[in-house]
Regions:
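Extracellular polysaccharide-degrading/modifying enzymes targeting complex plant/algal/animal polysaccharides
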Residues: 1-216, 221, 228, 234-236
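Hydrophobic, small-residue-rich alpha-helical packing segments that form membrane-like cores
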Residues: 236-266
Length: 266
């Protein structure tokens, strides 16, 4: 990546204090919920937060704390300490916010885990609490991300949140490109107990959270709208009655498209 990396001082563009990166997942101790997240887009396509390996996963070698944790006969550990293989993680020892993404116990329960420290002698990751809900097992697939030292492929990027500097390895010529960063960390529409309100023909994009939230209320209409390039769910309707979603396009969202719930569950 030498000579191909570009950097941007976000303060020059009015982007000030940056919140810590917080990611969850189904198995996360932080809860299965949308955590607003910044994303970088190049000509409308999401870029990759710098990671290793560049594709696929590596496996946990062992879980050193044998605390007797067992689920359905599968042995693991509730303690966030993981043995890794090889020398690569030694490069990350001074990185400020290393994350590991993996399926730590079951192949359907994912989470992002923050690394508190790396013991290069023991080849051990020490994770921050709260730990993954189901715990951890040897052989679990994972990859590391949010690593400045691992920008080595076109499309990878990293944000130094303390300095406000964004680093990017562009996948093509920047001169004619649209490079966009999603910075809004709340829904574009939050309608709580709102009734008889319509939204027509609007485009909501480049948000880090859910796009539109309607909670309670009645007879709200969202028609012919577009929700795209966001970090959470596109449109959330929770409770209320007689709401209508009509002819909307929802795509390129980080979590899901439409999430509709309600009714009498008794």
């Amino acid at each position: 990546a030498r000579g191909k990396l570009v950097q941007v001082d976000l303060a020059r563009y009015g982007i000030g204090e940056l919140k810590p990166l917080r990611l969850g997942g189904y198995n996360s101790g932080l809860g299965f919920t949308t955590h607003p997240v910044m994303e970088l887009f190049f000509n409308g396509e999401p870029m990759t937060l710098a990671r290793w390996p560049n594709e696929g996963f590596v496996q946990v070698v062992d879980v050193p704390v044998k605390d007797g944790h067992t689920i359905h006969g599968l042995e693991g550990s509730k303690t966030g300490r993981l043995i890794y293989e090889g020398e690569r993680p030694a490069r990350w020892k001074d990185e400020p916010a290393v994350l590991l993404y993996g399926y730590w116990f079951f192949g359907w329960a994912d989470s992002y885990e923050r690394v508190a420290s790396i013991d290069t002698e023991k080849r051990e990751f020490v994770l921050e609490e709260p730990y993954a809900g189901y715990g951890y097992r040897a052989g679990a697939p994972y990859y590391a991300l949010n690593l400045l030292s691992e920008i080595d492929m076109p499309g990878e990027w990293y944000l130094d949140r303390a300095a406000g500097i964004l680093y990017f390895y562009p996948p093509a010529d920047l001169s004619e490109a649209a490079v966009e960063l999603s910075v809004i960390d709340f829904p574009f529409v939050q309608a709580d107990n709102v009734s008889h309100t319509s939204f027509r023909g609007l485009v909501w994009e480049l948000g880090g959270a859910n796009g539109v939230e309607i909670r309670g209320g009645s007879q709200c209409l969202i028609a012919g709208c577009t929700v795209r390039r966001g970090g959470g769910d596109g449109i959330v309707v929770a409770g209320g009655n007689s709401h209508t979603l009509l002819g909307c396009d929802v795509y390129s969202m980080g979590r899901g498209g439409l999430l509709v719930s309600g009714g009498d569950r008794k």
